[in-house]
């Protein structure tokens, strides 16, 4: 019983310590307009991540949609 309570407390502490994304890094202010730095996912509408390695691509962490940039060098 004590072990179960200990696990619950550890899970609660881990949940509280999660790092949230800093939303202000996704936008750029140009004059009086606010622009999004990254692309939006065409499937679900969330902000996509730009990856450079191993292949340059845009990927959505929410739905898994991926756009590859350029031709693949592997054959």
Curated annotation (Swiss-Prot):
Gene Ontology biological process: translation
Protein keywords: Metal-binding, Ribonucleoprotein, Ribosomal protein, Zinc, Zinc-finger
ZnF locations on chain (C4-type): 41-63
SMART domains (UniProt xref): Ribosomal_S27 (SM01402)
Keyword presence, Flavoprotein: no
Gene Ontology CC: ribonucleoprotein complex; ribosome
Cofactor entry: Zn(2+)
SUPFAM superfamilies to which the protein is assigned, alphabetical: Zn-binding ribosomal proteins
Superkingdom as given in the UniProt entry: Archaea
Residues binding Zn(2+), per UniProt: 41, 44, 60, 63
GO molecular function: structural constituent of ribosome; zinc ion binding
Cofactor note: Binds 1 zinc ion per subunit.
Protein family (similarity comment): Belongs to the eukaryotic ribosomal protein eS31 family.
Subunit details: Part of the 30S ribosomal subunit.
Name assigned to this protein: Small ribosomal subunit protein eS31
Protein's organism: Saccharolobus solfataricus (strain ATCC 35092 / DSM 1617 / JCM 11322 / P2) (Sulfolobus solfataricus)
High-level lineage: Archaea, Thermoproteota, Thermoprotei, Sulfolobales, Sulfolobaceae
């Amino acid at each position: 019983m004590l072990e179960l309570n200990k696990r619950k407390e550890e899970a609660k502490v881990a949940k509280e310590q999660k790092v949230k994304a800093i939303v202000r890094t996704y936008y750029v202010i140009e004059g009086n307009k606010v622009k999004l730095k990254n692309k939006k996912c065409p499937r679900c509408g969330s902000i996509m991540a730009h990856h450079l390695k191993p292949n340059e691509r845009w990927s959505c962490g929410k739905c898994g949609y991926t756009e590859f940039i350029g031709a693949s060098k592997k054959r």
